C-alpha cells in the first residue's frame, strides 16, 4: 500500500475555533506544521466572500489569537505560533492603507479648495455694498423654539402632579402601580445581552471588558470585538463607563431610604397608609425612569475637558444630543437643569385649557398615562412611541393641539 510522505510525517491534528467578523463560527482542523498562511486560505474558503483566485484576497486578511490578542505571522507554522488545540482564532480583514497622493493630485485638490473657499467678511461687504439694509430678529425666532421645548416639559411636570393626585383616590391604585413598578424592574435597557457576552468571553476576552464593549456598540458582537482589539493596549480600557457606577450607587441608596421610610410609617389610618405607599411607589418609578446619558457622548465631551456632572447635565437638558450639549456647555447654559423640574403656572390659560379638555381629563385617571408622562419627561425621544399608543396617543394629541393653538394666538 502506498502512503504519501507528507501524511507519514504529519504533525498532531488540532481543532481550532474560527470566528469571522460577521459573527459566523466554525471548527477548522489543521496539523501543527501547517503554516498560518495555509490555515488562512482554508478559513477563507469556508467563510470569506470573494474569489480565492485573486492572491491579494489572502493578503488582505489576518488571523488573530483571541486569548493573547496577537496577530499571527503568515510565514510561521501553527506550532511556532504556540497555538493549542481548541484555541479561538479571529479572521479579520486588514485595513487598507490610504494611498499616497501624487503631487499633481495634491495641487489640483488645493486649487479646488481655494475655488470652493467661503468668502471672507471684506468680500461679502464689497458684494453687498449696493443692496438695501435689512435686519432679521433671529434671537426672537430662537427664543420661540426654546420656549416651545421648555413649555412642553413644564406641562408634563404639572400634569404628572395632577395625575398622581387623581390616581391616589383610586382604591386599586397601589396594586396597579406595584405591577408597574415590577415591570420597570424587568427593564433590560441597562442589561447586557447574555448570549453576546458569552460569545465574547468564549473568545478569551475578560467579562468586564466585553460588557463595556457591548454597551458602547449597542450589543453588536462584531463591532464590540473590533473595539476590544483596537483598544487592547489602551490603559483606560478597564475604566467603567461614566455615570454607570454612580447610577447603581444612587439607586441602591434610594432603595435603602425608601425601605426605611416605609418601615417608619407605623400604625395609622388605612387610607393614609395607602397614600404613603403610593407616594413611595411614585418615587421609585421616577428613580427608575431617571435620565440615562449616552455613554459615548459622555466620553467624547469629557475628553474635551468638561466635568462629568456638567456633561450629564448638558446631555439631560439637550435630550442626549451631543452637538447641542457641547454648545450648551460653551454658551450661557440656559435653561439650567433646575429649570427642567419646574412646572407650568397652574393659573395660566394654557394649563387651564388642557385640564378642561375631556380627553385629557379621562386620560389622567389612567395609570398608563402617568407612566407615559414620566417616560417622556426623562426620555423625550420616546414621545413618538407614546403618540402611537392607543391609550396615551389621544391625550398627547389633544395637548399638542391646545398648545399649538394658544401658541399661535
UniProtKB/Swiss-Prot annotation:
The modification N-acetylmethionine is found at residue 1. Residues 357-396 form the STI1 domain. This is Ubiquitin-associated domain-containing protein 1. GO terms for molecular function: polyubiquitin modification-dependent protein binding; proteasome binding. It comes from Rattus norvegicus (Rat). Its main location: cytoplasm. The UBA domains recognize and bind polyubiquitinated proteins. Residues 245-264 have a biased composition (Low complexity). It is found in: Cytoplasm. Residues 235-273 are annotated as: Disordered. Gene3D superfamilies: 1.10.260.100, DNA helicase RuvA subunit, C-terminal domain (1.10.8.10). The keyword Cytoplasm applies. Transmembrane segments: none annotated. Pfam families: UBA_7, UBL_UBAC1. Component of the KPC complex composed of RNF123/KPC1 and UBAC1/KPC2. Interacts (via ubiquitin-like domain) with RNF123. Interacts (via ubiquitin-like and UBA domains) with the proteasome via its N-terminal domain. Non-catalytic component of the KPC complex, a E3 ubiquitin-protein ligase complex that mediates polyubiquitination of target proteins, such as CDKN1B and NFKB1. The KPC complex catalyzes polyubiquitination and proteasome-mediated degradation of CDKN1B during G1 phase of the cell cycle. The KPC complex also acts as a key regulator of the NF-kappa-B signaling by promoting maturation of the NFKB1 component of NF-kappa-B by catalyzing ubiquitination of the NFKB1 p105 precursor. One of its GO terms (cellular component) is cytoplasm. Pathway: Protein modification; protein ubiquitination. InterPro entries: STI1_HS-bd, UBA, UBA-like_sf, UBA1_UBAC1, UBA2_UBAC1, UBAC1, Ubiquitin-like_domsf. PROSITE patterns: UBA. Keywords: Acetylation, Cytoplasm, Repeat, Ubl conjugation pathway. Residues 187-231, 292-332 form the UBA domain. CDD domains: UBA1_KPC2, UBA2_KPC2, Ubl_KPC2.
Amino acid at each position: 500500500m502506498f502512503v504519501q510522505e507528507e501524511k507519514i510525517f504529519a504533525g498532531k491534528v488540532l481543532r481550532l475555533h474560527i470566528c469571522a467578523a460577521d459573527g459566523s463560527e466554525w471548527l477548522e482542523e489543521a496539523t501543527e506544521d501547517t503554516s498560518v498562511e495555509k490555515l488562512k486560505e482554508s478559513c477563507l474558503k469556508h467563510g470569506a466572500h470573494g474569489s480565492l483566485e485573486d492572491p491579494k484576497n489572502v493578503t488582505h486578511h489576518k488571523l488573530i489569537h483571541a486569548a493573547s490578542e496577537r496577530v499571527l505571522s503568515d510565514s510561521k507554522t501553527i506550532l511556532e505560533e504556540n497555538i493549542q488545540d481548541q484555541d479561538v482564532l479571529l479572521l479579520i480583514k486588514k485595513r487598507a492603507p490610504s494611498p499616497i497622493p501624487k503631487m499633481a493630485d495634491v495641487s489640483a485638490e488645493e486649487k479646488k479648495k481655494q475655488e470652493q473657499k467661503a468668502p471672507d467678511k471684506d468680500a461679502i461687504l464689497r458684494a453687498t455694498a449696493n443692496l438695501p439694509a435689512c435686519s432679521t430678529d433671529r434671537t426672537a425666532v430662537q427664543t420661540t423654539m426654546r420656549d416651545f421645548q421648555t413649555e412642553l416639559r413644564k406641562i408634563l411636570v404639572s400634569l404628572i402632579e395632577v395625575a398622581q393626585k387623581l390616581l391616589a383616590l383610586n382604591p386599586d391604585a397601589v396594586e396597579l402601580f406595584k405591577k408597574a413598578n415590577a415591570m420597570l424592574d424587568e427593564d433590560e435597557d441597562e442589561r447586557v445581552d447574555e448570549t453576546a457576552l458569552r460569545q465574547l468571553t468564549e473568545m478569551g476576552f475578560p467579562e468586564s471588558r466585553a460588557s463595556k464593549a457591548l454597551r458602547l456598540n449597542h450589543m453588536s458582537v462584531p463591532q464590540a470585538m473590533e473595539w476590544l482589539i483596537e483598544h487592547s493596549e489602551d490603559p483606560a480600557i478597564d475604566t467603567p463607563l461614566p455615570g454607570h457606577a454612580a447610577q447603581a450607587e444612587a439607586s441602591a441608596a434610594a432603595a435603602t431610604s425608601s425601605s426605611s421610610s416605609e418601615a417608619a410609617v407605623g400604625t395609622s389610618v388605612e387610607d393614609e397608609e395607602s397614600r404613603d405607599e403610593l407616594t413611595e411607589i411614585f418615587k421609585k418609578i421616577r428613580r427608575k425612569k431617571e435620565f440615562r446619558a449616552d455613554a459615548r457622548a459622555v466620553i467624547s465631551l469629557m475628553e474635551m475637558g468638561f466635568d462629568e456632572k456638567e456633561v450629564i447635565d448638558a446631555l439631560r437638558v439637550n435630550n442626549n444630543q451631543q452637538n447641542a450639549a457641547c454648545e450648551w456647555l460653551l454658551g450661557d447654559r440656559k435653561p439650567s437643569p433646575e429649570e427642567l423640574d419646574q412646572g407650568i403656572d397652574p393659573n395660566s390659560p394654557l394649563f387651564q385649557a388642557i385640564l378642561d379638555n375631556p380627553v385629557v381629563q379621562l386620560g389622567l385617571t389612567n395609570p398608563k398615562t402617568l407612566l407615559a408622562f414620566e417616560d417622556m419627561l426623562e426620555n423625550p425621544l420616546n414621545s413618538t412611541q407614546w403618540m402611537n399608543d392607543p391609550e396615551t396617543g389621544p391625550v398627547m394629541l389633544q395637548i399638542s393641539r391646545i398648545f399649538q393653538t394658544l401658541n399661535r394666538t
